[in-house]
Amino acid sequence: MNAVNTSAQSRFHSVEAATENNAVQEQAIAVFRGPHQPATDIAAKVQALETLLTQAASEFDSIALASSLAAEDNVLFDVIARLKLNIRVFSLNTGRLHQQTLDVAPALQAKYGQTVAWFEPQAAAVETYVNTKGRDAFYESTALRKECCGIRKVEPLARALQGAKAWVTGQRQAQAATRAELPLREFDADRGIEKFNP
């Protein structure tokens, strides 16, 4: 398995690691480097990413990065912050995130001076789901998993993207077979806005 895909390396190990001068650059190398790729290929990919995000920010006056605070998203955050792009950054706090994940946002804010906006599920909906189906009911069936995701992810995402004309994700083709054909840019018909998957 590729080192990029391991949980330990896909997130910052600590707040201190997130604030080190080269932490994001090291993540960029980990994200963009495939087996035996020379550094020049990485530089070209970073340049292409910078160009894409710059063009997206100039094309859309209301654009947002949906950040999971994983390595891929932190590379995007770094580019947005360094280039001072008008792309707001948000994350979904599902109520089930690990503390290490939660610690990344303030570290990024401290390093770059750019805020990560948090969107959470409606407390009443979560409470009803947990009380009637159980805290971990999403393990029991596909229907319960989809219901939980609807409450904890889909609805908060809809609020986070309200008013946006485009959004950016950290999804990668290598993450899953279902993402193998993930386009760089697509129209998100569910939300009626453009979507970038750099």
Task: Identify the function of each model-found stretch.
Residues 2-198:
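Nucleotide-activated chemistry modules centered on ATP-dependent adenylation/adenylyltransferase
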